[in-house]
Each structure stands twice: as structure tokens, then as C-alpha cells.
A protein has these predicted regions:
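Acidic, proline/glycine-enriched N-terminal capping motif
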Residues: 1-139
Length: 139
């Protein structure tokens, strides 16, 4: 079975853990909020009774960023035709860490993900697309 999920809005990466004065680590509020949003979208699409995927999985993440308002007409065209790519934050590795948000819901553990592709590009509508399938299954 394949999973496909579209998350509206500019892509957000997982924030670094923060520490209290006593050394206790905690996840930043922005990250917790975004992970909860991803979970809610998944449950809305697939239902709360979804059986988590088993075995090795392949994951593709497409991050579409909004075109900056300051971009010239030519730059806008280059961005839409994938001749220019976003090289700003968030980093692709921090975007991929958001797979933690679907642990226990879409799959048992993100350790099952054995193949990962993350792509950043510009789009008229900012969003993130996540596609997951068992290894060997047709795309």
C-alpha cells in the first residue's frame, strides 16, 4: 500500500532540541505544532484506524517553496521551470526528520525507511508532498 500526503504551506524542518537550565531537553513549540499538524492531516485522510506499514519502506519528499515577492519576472520563470532552486533553510536533512511525526501512525518506526529522496523547488503554491511505499512496489 502507498501513502501520499500533501501538507499545505511553506515547508518546515524539524528544529534542534532545546535545553533548560537544568539540562532537560525539549522539542521547540514550532516543531511540535507542525508535527501535530502532519499527524492530523494523515488521520483526516487515512483514518485513525489505519494499520501502520510493515517492512522496509521508500520515502520521497517534495518541498515546494513560495517564490519570493522580490524575484524578477525572469527569475520567477527560472524558479517555476526548475532552473533555480531554493538553497535556503530548512535543510533537507531537517525536513526528512519530520518523518518522526508519523511514527506509530503510518509506520511502526522511521527506522523502516531504507530509501529517502528529498527535493526542494519553487512553486506558485507552497506545500510539501510525502510519498511512502514498501520497497519494490511500483511508484
Amino acid at each position: 500500500m502507498k501513502i501520499s500526503l500533501v501538507i499545505p504551506g511553506n515547508p518546515v524542518g524539524k528544529g534542534r532540541p532545546r535545553f533548560t537550565r537544568r539540562g532537560h531537553a525539549f522539542t521547540p513549540k514550532k516543531t511540535r505544532t507542525h508535527e501535530a499538524f502532519i499527524k492530523a492531516l494523515f488521520i483526516q485522510k487515512y483514518g485513525a484506524d489505519f494499520t501502520p506499514l510493515e517492512g522496509p519502506l521508500e520515502m520521497e519528499i517534495l518541498c515546494c517553496f513560495a517564490i519570493p515577492a522580490s524575484a524578477s519576472k525572469k527569475r520567477r520563470q527560472d524558479m517555476l521551470w526548475q532552473r533555480e532552486f531554493p538553497t535556503k533553510r530548512p535543510d533537507v536533512d531537517n525536513i526528512a526528520k519530520l518523518s518522526d511525526a508519523l511514527n506509530g501512525i503510518a509506520w511502526r518506526d522511521d527506522a523502516q525507511i531504507v530509501s529517502l529522496a528529498v527535493m526542494k523547488q519553487y512553486s506558485k503554491k507552497p506545500h510539501m508532498e510525502i510519498k511512502v511505499r514498501p520497497v519494490g512496489e511500483e511508484p
